[in-house]
Design a protein with these regions (language model features):
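N-terminal secretory signal peptides and thylakoid transit peptides that target proteins
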Residues: 2-21
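C-terminal extensions of enzymes
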Residues: 17-20, 390-432
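C-terminal segment of N-terminal export signals and the immediately downstream linker at the start
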Residues: 27-75, 92
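Metal- or metallocofactor-binding catalytic centers and their adjacent structured scaffolds
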Residues: 46-47, 88, 92-163
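Conserved, mostly hydrophobic/aromatic
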Residues: 90, 152, 165, 255, ...
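Shared catalytic-loop signature of beta/alpha-barrel
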Residues: 114, 119, 126, 130, ...
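Glycine-rich, aromatic-flanked loop segments that form ligand/cofactor-binding clefts
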Residues: 153-191
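Metal-dependent enolase-superfamily TIM-barrel catalytic cores that perform enediolate-based chemistry
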Residues: 178-298
Length: 432
């Protein structure tokens, strides 16, 4: 559907995104159990995914000698955070933390940092598995653990990339594309249709965009008012209006953020299909696995899910049970790129796509395109909100511009961006 609003069914969507890809083996959590009553076909599918999860991601062979993690710092300035890692031999990497680090820094300092110190960074796959066991960290599963864990992983990958003289994409896979096509992600579900449309038009107008995602449903997350509901009939009005406004050449996606119950999700899914939307994201709550599967099997429009997921188990179940078309782990929420690559490889094993969710702010857009550039089964368009950020940096190999709907992927070592050293020096270490 790239560049076209012509309708497409689930199978056609999957074939298009996979055309240039090959199936990869993957790595991650091993030892998930196969239900005793599972059919032979299901047992075979689960076993295939488990085998995929056993394979490593980081290219250890690029580093002949141990890379011992000597220090791991969390730095702050004006309520924003950086992570800086240094090896025993003096190599350094820096990442930009998610905006919620102001609430999660104790987990970084007390639950995660002690486990990483003294470890060989070449063992990053194993470290990311075992840190969940240390200090019963799995009890904190979800964004509370995933966000600080990803922040640490990004800094280590940046360090390793600089040591190897390679971009992060070449550490976790093979560069599949020099540019990543993006869609404009919009919000404003709480606003009337006319105001929403005006804001959507303004957002799209800022960049050379050929794909757009809108919000549907009435998830009122932005208020403490327990009786708050969205504008009546907003979804039914805005879906056809957005198609009419942007025409058939704009690829459209829709995101409900888990708002609907199954019957309403079916109804809205049919509406989206009528107006040639390319997928329906989080139609029901992310962990309602059986409902997600039912939607995927009953609706022709592809179903996307995984932004909120925090373990491999949900993806494993949905993929094994033919219950999901597009996997959407978030680089930050899910605990980093290596874990996200493992999900991508699971999806590839059954011909499914990955379109990662992207957290806004910081350098999330560059982290996301590095990941996507390494994935053979990446979908057609990937999340983008803007280049606005508090971070002071230079991008010598990739301009901050969307050109013909695409962002150039940095090719420099690490994440390919250079933080302003004077700005970094202004940050102070967070004490545990």
């Amino acid at each position: 559907m790239a560049g076209s609003g012509e309708g497409m069914g689930r199978r056609q969507f999957l074939r298009m995104g996979m055309a240039a890809g090959t199936v990869l083996a993957g790595g991650g959590e091993a030892g998930a159990r196969i239900p005793a009553g599972a059919s032979p076909a299901l047992r075979a599918r689960l076993a295939k995914l488990d085998e995929v999860l056993k394979q490593p991601v980081l290219k250890r062979e690029l580093f002949r000698s141990p890379v011992i993690i000597e220090s791991l710092e969390l730095l702050h300035l004006d309520g924003k955070y950086l992570c800086r890692v240094r090896s025993r031999d003096g190599a350094e990497g820096i990442s930009v933390a998610h905006s919620t680090m102001d609430r999660l820094y104790p987990i970084f300092l007390r639950n995660l940092r002690p486990f990483f110190l003294g470890k060989d960074a070449r063992e990053l796959d194993l470290i990311l598995d075992k840190v969940y066991i240390y200090d019963f960290n799995f009890r904190l599963n979800g964004l509370a653990l995933g966000l600080p864990l990803a922040t640490i992983e990004f800094a280590i990958l940046d360090m390793l990339g600089r040591m190897a003289g390679k971009p992060v994409s070449d550490l976790i896979g093979e560069r599949q594309r020099a540019e990543v096509a993006v869609y404009m992600a919009t919000e404003w579900r709480e606003k009337p249709v006319e105001e929403s449309l005006r804001l959507i038009r303004e957002a799209v107008g800022e960049h050379d965009i050929h794909a757009l995602k809108i919000k549907v449903g009435g998830l009122m997350f932005m208020t403490t008012d327990m009786s708050a509901v969205g504008p009546p009939g907003r979804t039914e009005k805005i879906v056809p209006l957005v198609r009419k406004t942007f025409g058939d050449r704009m690829t459209l996606y829709a995101d409900a953020n888990g708002f609907y119950e199954l019957p309403e999700a079916l109804r809205v899914g049919r509406l989206l299909q009528e107006y040639q939307f390319a997928y329906f994201e989080e139609p029901v709550m992310f962990d309602h696995l059986e409902e997600i599967r039912e939607l995927a099997q009953r609706l022709p429009i592809p179903i996307a899910n995984g932004e909120q997921d925090y373990s491999f188990y949900g993806f494993r179940w949905l993929l094994a049970n033919d219950g999901l078309d597009v996997v959407q782990p978030d680089n930050y929420y899910f605990g980093g790129m290596i874990r996200s690559v493992k999900v991508a490889r699971m999806a590839a094993a059954f011909g499914r796509q990955i379109i990662p969710h992207m957290s806004g702010g910081g350098l999330g857009f560059f982290y996301n395109v590095q990941l996507v550039s390494a994935l053979p089964n990446a979908g057609l368009h990937h999340e983008f909100k803007s280049f606005r950020t508090h971070v002071r940096f230079d991008s010598p190999t990739a301009p901050l511009k969307v050109m013909d709907g695409r962002i150039k992927v940095p090719t420099g070592p690490g994440f390919g961006v250079d933080l302003d050293p004077d700005w970094v020096k202004k940050h102070e270490p967070v004490r545990g």
